[in-house]
């Protein structure tokens, strides 16, 4: 499926991010913020991953699809802790290669499938999964509702889906909305809210949590960890990129503290269609 120029640029940036994320310095920061022990760019913390595993009722009989799986966090962790089979799907191949090697190192390759693919057109012809998860993925995609429809198509009728997402608070002034967009993922904007999207695409809401405060804590931890490792980060990235990154974190946290953005956790189940 053809990507727009902006989507291609996003993929190229992610490929580079996964390369850099393998650095021991970045790993130390990631572990400090998320407590995960995995290469990755997801904001999911270990406690959040455990919560998602419970919401999805994962066990050794479960088949999990992780969309936007990156380098395997938290999908590999969910599989390791629950014993389920996980299919990791994403577009950037660098992250998937890292995930594949991690699965081999953890001796769980027999329960891990790694696929390069676009969530707008999932490569499965029948309902194949008992659970679907994605972490801060929809806010990085243009075709959000199309992806939700595809998730609905490939999940069992009794399945569960859990996902986190960053979104812009409603009813902002033009100036505040512009400020929110500037510090958000590439495609954070949407014509309708996520509850409406879910209703439109065949899902019913089971549980909802506003996890904005937890995200703000993660941002603060990130800024502190980078401050502690400033010298190493300057050597790794260069002083200009370090300063740009520092300013970006400050602006992001400022927008969240101002109430312009939120991070949400949705747990849903498919609406059963009438025969």
Predicted feature descriptions by range:
Residues 1-33:
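N-terminal, positively charged/glycine-rich alpha-helical extensions of SAM-dependent methyltransferases
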Residues 130-143:
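A short SAM/SAH-binding and catalytic strip from SAM-dependent methyltransferases
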Residues 63-121:
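Class I SAM-dependent methyltransferase SAM/SAH-binding core
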Residues 42-60:
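Conserved alpha-helix/loop element of class I SAM-dependent methyltransferases that forms part
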Residues 120-131:
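A short acidic, Gly/Pro-enriched loop at the edge of an enzyme's catalytic core
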Residues 145-160:
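A short glycine-rich, Lys/Arg-flanked "PGG" loop and its adjoining helix->strand segment in the class I
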Residues 163-186:
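Short, glycine-/aromatic-enriched active-site segment of Class I SAM-dependent methyltransferases
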Residues 209-275:
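Conserved Class I S-adenosyl-L-methionine
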């Amino acid at each position: 499926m053809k990507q727009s120029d902006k989507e291609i640029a996003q993929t190229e940036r992610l490929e580079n991010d996964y390369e850099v994320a393998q650095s021991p310095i970045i790993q130390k920061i990631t572990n400090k913020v998320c407590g995960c022990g995995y290469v990755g760019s997801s904001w999911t913390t270990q406690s959040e991953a455990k919560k998602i595993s419970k919401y999805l009722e994962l066990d050794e009989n479960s088949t999990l699809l992780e969309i936007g799986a990156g380098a395997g966090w938290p999908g590999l962790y969910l599989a390791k802790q629950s014993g389920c089979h996980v299919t990791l799907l994403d577009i950037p191949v660098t992250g998937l290669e890292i995930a594949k090697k991690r699965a081999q190192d953890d001796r769980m390759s027999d329960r891990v499938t790694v696929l390069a693919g676009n969530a707008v057109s999932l490569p499965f012809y029948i309902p194949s999964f008992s659970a679907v998860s994605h972490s801060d993925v929809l806010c990085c995609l243009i075709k959000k509702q199309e992806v939700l429809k595809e998730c609905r198509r490939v999940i069992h009728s009794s399945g569960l889906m859990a996902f986190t997402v960053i979104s812009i608070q409603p009813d902002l002034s033009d100036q505040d909305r512009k400020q929110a967009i500037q510090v958000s993922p590439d495609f954070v904007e949407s014509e309708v809210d996520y509850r409406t999207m879910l209703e439109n695409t065949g899902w019913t809401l089971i549980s909802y949590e506003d996890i904005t405060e937890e995200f703000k804590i993660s941002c603060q931890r990130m800024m502190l960890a980078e401050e502690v490792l400033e010298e190493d980060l300057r050597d790794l990235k260069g002083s200009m990129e370090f300063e740009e990154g520092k300013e970006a974190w400050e602006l992001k946290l400022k927008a969240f503290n101002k109430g312009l953005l939120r991070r949400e956790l949705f747990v849903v189940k498919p609406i059963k269609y009438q025969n």
